[in-house]
C-alpha cells in the first residue's frame, strides 16, 4: 500500500494523545484510506506525515513541520483558491483525493471546527468544470466477471449498461467510451483498459446481486436490465458514485437525483469500430498532422456551437447506427437544415449562447450550483423559445426535427423563478449577500432597509459632529476590528463632548464612539448578519425548486444537443459540398469521393470513384507509394462511417451498404511494451479480421506481410485474399506492393483490380492520384527512394539490380552484387515498401542504416 494513503503510523501510535484537530485528521484518513486527504485549516488545505512528503514532492511545494505535544509532523499545504490545479496534478499522478472542508464557520464553533469530506475526487468522478473537457464526456466504467459493463458520467448523469460476450468485446466497447476510471469487481478482467484509465478494485459487497438490484431500482425504478451481470455492474457503479459524492458544505449528503435515466443498449445495434479502426481512420485523434492541427474526423465535423452538441457529436461517432430508418431520419433532418439556410444560421447563432445545461442542472441537483450557475441556466432556457421558432418550418419536413422541437421545453416557471429571485450579476460567494433581488422577499427587504438607513445615518454623522463640536478635522471611519469610530486629532481633544467614549488611542489621535453610534452599528451588524443568513436560505430554496425540474431540463438539454449536431452536420455539408448518401445499397458506389479531412488541407485534392458491387466486393489496389492508395481506402471507410452517423458525405453521389463492422489493417508499428514485433502486431490484427469479417463487414488492408521476408509476405497476402474472397465475402479494399497478387485477383470471380498510376519524369515520378481499373505497371519504389533522399550509391545499385531482374526474370534472392557478393533478399523489398507518408524521420534513418549494413 502507498505510504501516503491511510492513517499516518506516527499519529496512529499516539492517537489518544493527539490534539483534537490532528485526531480529526487521523479519523478522516482512516475512513478514506484509499485517498490523499486534503484537510482544510483556514485558507489552506493541509496534509501531514507521509502524505505531506508525497504532496510536497508531486506539487513542488514547501514541506514544513507542525509541532504538537506528541511530536513534530511533516506538513504541506496548498491555498484553497488554487486547489483545483493542484488536485489535477495529484489525479494525474494516480491518486484519489478526499477534500475535507470546514463545514461550520470558525467563529461559530464552540470548540473544534467541524469538518467533513465534501467530495472524493477521482479521475472518473470529476464534477469540477475547470477539470473537465467541455466537449467530452468523463466516464467511470464498472466491469464484472460476467462481462456486465456499466458507464456513468457523474458530471452529467449519463448512465449506460450492457452485457458483452467476451474480453475482446469489452476492449472494443471501452474504446468507444474511453473511461477515465474503471471500477472492477472480484475476478473481473483488468487487462482490457487503456493506459490512461485508473483501475479501481472495489468492495465485494457492492457487487452482490440483491444489494445492486435494490440500488438500481432506487435510482431508475423498474429497469430493463436483461442480465444479473448488468445489474451488478450498474449497482456497484452507483455505490461508487455515492462513495465519491461526499457531503455538501452544509454537512448534508450530496444528492444524486439527477442520475435518473439508464440507457440499456446492445452493442450489436451499432457499427463496431474497434480500437485499431478508430486509430487508423483517425476518428478522434490524428495519426499524422496533415498540415492542420487537430486533423481528425471529429474536428472536421465539429461545427457545434455548444458543449452539449460537442459531446453529442462524439457519442454519435462512437456509435454509428445500423438501423436504416434511424439513419434516414437523421439524414432527413440534415437535408432540411441544409436547404433552410436562414433557419439553420439563426439556430446556430442562438446555440452559441447556450451554456452547458447538463452539467449546470447536475450541479443544481447536487446542491453545488452557485447564483451564477442559476443565471446561466436561466439564460440558456431563455434561448429555447427562439430555437423552437427556428424549427417551425423545418419540422414539417423532418420527423426528427419535429421530435426535437417538441422536446424543447423552456421551463417557463423555472426561468421566471430565477429571474424574479436572483440579481442579474450575482457575486461568486452565495453566503455573503448580494444574491437575492430586491422585492423577492419582504423580510429580506426590511433587513436591507434597516442596513441602508443605518449606513445613511452614519454617512451624515461626520458633518453633524463637525458642526456640533466645531472640530473641522473630525472624521468618521470603520475597520474590521473596532467597527465604526469618530477620530479626533490630539490638538482637538479638548473640544471632545462628554458623550464621546474612548475606543482606541493612536499616536496622533484618539478614536471614540457615542452610545447612539454604537446602537446604530449594532443594528447594522444584526441586519447584515440576519440578511446574509436569510438570503442564503432563500437562495437554497430557489435552488431546490429548480432542482425539482431536473428531468424536464435534462430532456431539453438532450434536444438542444441533438439540434446542435444536426445544424453542425448541415453546415459542414453545405460549406464543403457534401451529398446525401443512399443508405443500405447492395454495393459501394461513389462518384467523386473525397477524404473529409485531407481535402481540407490539400488545395488540389483529387476525387475518386468507387464501384464495388455485391457480386465483386473485393478490390486489389496497386500503385507506388505516395500515389494515394491509403488515403483512398480510408476515405471509402469514412464515407461509410459518416453515412451511418446520419451525415452527408464528401462526394458527388454515394450509395453504400450498412456495415456492422469496419476492420482496418493499416501501417506498421512495434508494440515494445507488449513485447511484440511489427510483424506480430500485424498478424494479430489480421487474425482478428479473418476471424470476424463477414458479408456485412468492410475490410481495409494496407499491405499485408510487409514485416517478414518477401516470399513469406506474398504467401500470406495471397492466402488472405483468397480467404476473404472465398470464405468471408466481406467488402474489401486491399492495397499491396505484391504485383503478383493482381494475377490472383484477375482469376477470382468476385474480385477486381484497381491501380493508381504514375509516370517517370525528369524530376523523378509524377503522381496523378487517379484510381483506374486494372493492375499497376510498376511500383516506382527506387524512384520514390531517390525522392526520399536515399544515398545515390544505394539508388544506383538498386536500379541496376532491378534492371537485371527484369531482363533475366530473376527473383530477388538470386541477384548478385557487382563484387560477387550476395544481395540480401529483403533489400529491394524494403525499398519498394517505403511509405513516405507513414515514415517518421527516425524510421527513415533506421532504414538507411539497415540498407547500408546489408550492402557492407
From Swiss-Prot:
The keyword Chaperone does not apply. One of its GO terms (molecular function) is mismatched DNA binding. GO terms for biological process: mismatch repair. InterPro entries: DNA_mismatch_repair_MutS, DNA_mismatch_repair_MutS-lik_N, DNA_mismatch_repair_MutS/MSH, DNA_mismatch_repair_MutS_C, DNA_mismatch_repair_MutS_clamp, DNA_mismatch_repair_MutS_core, DNA_mismatch_repair_MutS_N, DNA_mismatch_repair_MutS_sf. ATP binds at residues 623-630. Keywords: ATP-binding, DNA damage, DNA repair, DNA-binding, Nucleotide-binding. The keyword Nucleotide-binding applies. This protein is involved in the repair of mismatches in DNA. It is possible that it carries out the mismatch recognition step. This protein has a weak ATPase activity. NCBIfam families: mutS1, PRK05399.1. Belongs to the DNA mismatch repair MutS family. This is DNA mismatch repair protein MutS.
Amino acid at each position: 500500500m502507498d505510504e501516503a494513503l491511510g492513517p499516518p503510523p506516527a499519529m496512529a501510535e499516539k492517537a489518544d494523545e493527539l490534539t483534537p484537530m490532528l485526531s480529526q485528521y487521523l479519523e478522516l484518513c482512516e475512513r478514506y484510506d484509499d485517498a490523499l486527504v486534503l484537510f482544510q485549516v483556514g485558507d489552506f488545505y493541509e496534509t501531514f506525515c507521509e502524505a505531506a512528503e508525497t504532496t510536497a514532492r508531486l506539487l513542488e511545494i514547501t514541506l514544513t513541520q507542525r509541532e504538537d505535544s506528541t511530536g513534530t509532523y511533516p506538513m504541506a499545504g496548498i491555498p484553497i483558491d488554487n486547489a483545483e490545479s493542484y488536485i489535477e496534478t495529484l489525479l494525474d499522478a494516480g491518486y484519489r483525493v478526499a477534500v475535507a472542508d470546514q463545514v461550520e464557520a470558525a467563529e461559530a464553533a464552540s470548540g473544534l471546527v467541524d469538518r467533513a469530506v465534501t467530495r472524493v475526487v477521482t479521475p472518473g468522478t470529476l464534477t469540477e468544470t475547470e477539470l473537465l473537457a467541455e466537449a467530452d464526456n468523463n466516464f467511470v466504467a464498472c466491469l464484472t466477471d460476467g462481462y456486465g459493463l456499466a458507464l456513468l458520467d457523474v458530471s452529467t448523469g449519463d448512465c449506460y449498461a450492457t452485457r458483452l460476450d467476451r474480453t475482446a468485446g469489452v476492449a472494443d466497447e471501452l474504446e468507444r467510451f474511453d473511461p477515465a476510471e474503471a471500477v472492477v469487481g472480484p475476478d473481473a478482467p483488468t487487462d482490457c483498459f487503456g493506459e490512461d484509465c485508473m483501475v479501481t478494485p472495489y468492495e465485494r459487497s457492492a457487487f452482490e446481486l440483491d444489494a445492486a438490484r435494490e440500488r438500481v431500482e432506487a435510482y431508475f425504478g423498474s429497469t430493463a436490465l436483461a442480465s444479473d451481470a448488468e445489474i451488478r455492474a450498474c449497482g456497484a457503479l452507483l455505490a461508487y458514485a455515492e462513495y465519491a459524492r461526499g457531503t455538501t458544505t452544509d454537512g448534508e449528503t450530496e444528492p444524486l437525483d439527477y442520475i435518473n435515466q439508464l440507457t440499456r443498449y446492445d452493442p450489436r445495434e451499432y457499427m463496431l469500430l474497434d480500437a485499431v479502426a478508430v486509430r487508423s481512420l483517425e476518428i478522434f485523434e490524428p495519426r499524422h498532422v496533415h498540415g492542420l492541427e487537430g486533423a481528425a474526423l471529429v474536428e472536421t465535423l465539429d461545427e457545434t456551437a455548444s458543449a452539449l452538441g460537442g459531446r453529442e457529436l462524439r457519442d454519435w461517432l462512437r456509435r454509428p447506427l445500423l438501423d436504416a430508418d434511424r439513419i434516414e431520419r437523421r439524414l432527413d433532418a440534415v437535408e432540411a437544415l441544409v436547404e433552410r439556410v436562414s433557419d439553420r444560421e439563426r439556430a446556430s447563432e442562438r446555440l452559441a449562447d447556450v451554456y452547458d445545461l447538463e452539467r449546470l442542472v447536475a450541479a443544481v441537483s447536487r446542491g453545488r450550483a452557485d447564483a451564477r450557475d442559476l443565471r446561466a441556466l436561466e439564460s440558456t432556457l431563455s434561448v429555447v423559445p427562439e430555437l423552437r421558432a427556428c424549427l417551425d418550418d423545418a419540422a414539417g419536413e423532418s420527423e426528427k426535427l419535429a421530435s426535437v422541437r417538441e422536446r424543447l421545453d423552456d421551463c417557463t416557471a423555472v426561468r421566471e423563478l430565477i429571474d424574479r429571485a436572483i440579481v442579474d450579476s450575482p457575486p461568486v460567494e452565495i453566503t455573503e449577500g448580494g444574491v437575492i433581488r430586491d422585492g423577492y422577499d419582504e423580510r429580506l427587504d426590511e433587513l436591507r432597509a434597516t442596513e441602508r438607513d443605518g449606513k445613511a445615518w452614519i454617512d451624515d454623522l461626520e458633518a453633524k459632529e463637525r458642526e456640533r463640536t466645531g472640530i473641522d478635522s473630525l472624521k468618521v471611519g470603520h475597520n474590521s476590528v473596532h467597527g465604526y469610530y469618530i477620530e479626533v486629532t490630539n490638538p482637538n481633544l479638548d473640544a471632545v463632548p462628554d458623550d464621546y467614549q474612548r475606543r482606541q488611542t493612536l499616536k496622533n489621535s484618539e478614536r471614540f464612539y457615542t452610545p447612539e453610534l454604537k446602537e446604530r452599528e449594532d443594528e447594522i451588524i444584526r441586519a447584515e448578519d440576519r440578511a446574509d443568513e436569510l438570503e442564503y436560505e432563500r437562495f437554497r430554496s430557489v435552488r431546490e425548486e429548480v432542482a425539482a425540474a431536473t428531468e424536464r431540463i435534462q430532456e431539453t438539454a438532450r434536444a438542444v444537443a441533438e439540434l446542435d449536431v444536426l445544424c453542425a452536420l448541415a453546415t459542414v455539408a453545405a460549406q464543403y459540398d457534401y451529398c446525401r448518401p443512399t443508405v443500405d445499397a447492395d454495393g459501394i458506389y461513389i462518384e467523386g469521393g473525397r477524404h473529409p479531412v485531407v481535402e481540407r488541407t490539400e488545395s488540389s485534392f483529387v476525387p475518386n470513384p468507387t464501384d464495388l458491387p455485391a457480386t465483386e466486393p473485393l478490390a486489389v489496389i496497386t500503385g507506388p507509394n505516395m500515389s494515394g492508395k491509403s488515403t483512398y481506402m480510408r476515405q471509402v471507410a469514412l464515407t461509410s462511417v459518416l453515412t451511418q452517423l446520419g451525415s452527408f458525405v464528401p462526394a458527388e453521389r454515394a450509395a453504400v451498404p450498412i456495415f456492422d463492422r469496419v476492420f482496418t489493417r493499416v501501417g506498421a508499428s512495434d508494440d515494445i511494451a507488449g513485447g511484440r514485433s511489427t510483424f506480430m502486431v500485424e498478424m494479430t490484427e489480421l487474425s482478428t479480421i479473418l476471424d470476424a469479417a463477414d458479408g456485412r463487414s468492410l475490410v481495409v488492408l494496407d499491405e499485408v506481410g510487409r514485416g517478414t521476408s518477401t516470399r513469406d509476405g506474398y504467401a500470406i497476402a495471397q492466402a488472405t485474399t483468397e480467404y476473404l474472397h472465398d470464405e468471408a465475402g466481406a467488402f474489401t479494399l486491399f492495397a499491396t506492393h505484391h504485383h503478383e497478387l493482381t494475377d490472383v485477383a484477375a482469376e477470382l470471380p468476385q474480385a477486381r483490380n484497381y491501380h493508381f498510376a504514375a509516370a517517370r519524369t525528369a524530376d523523378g515520378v509524377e503522381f496523378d492520384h487517379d484510381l483506374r481499373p486494372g493492375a499497376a505497371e510498376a511500383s516506382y519504389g527506387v524512384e520514390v527512394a531517390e525522392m526520399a533522399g536515399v544515398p545515390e550509391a544505394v539508388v544506383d545499385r538498386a536500379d541496376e539490380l532491378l534492371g537485371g531482374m527484369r531482363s533475366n526474370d530473376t527473383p530477388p534472392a538470386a541477384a548478385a552484387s557487382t563484387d560477387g557478393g550476395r544481395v540480401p533478399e529483403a533489400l529491394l523489398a524494403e525499398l519498394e515498401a517505403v511509405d513516405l507518408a507513414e515514415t517518421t524521420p527516425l524510421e527513415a534513418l533506421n532504414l538507411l542504416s539497415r540498407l547500408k549494413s546489408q550492402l557492407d
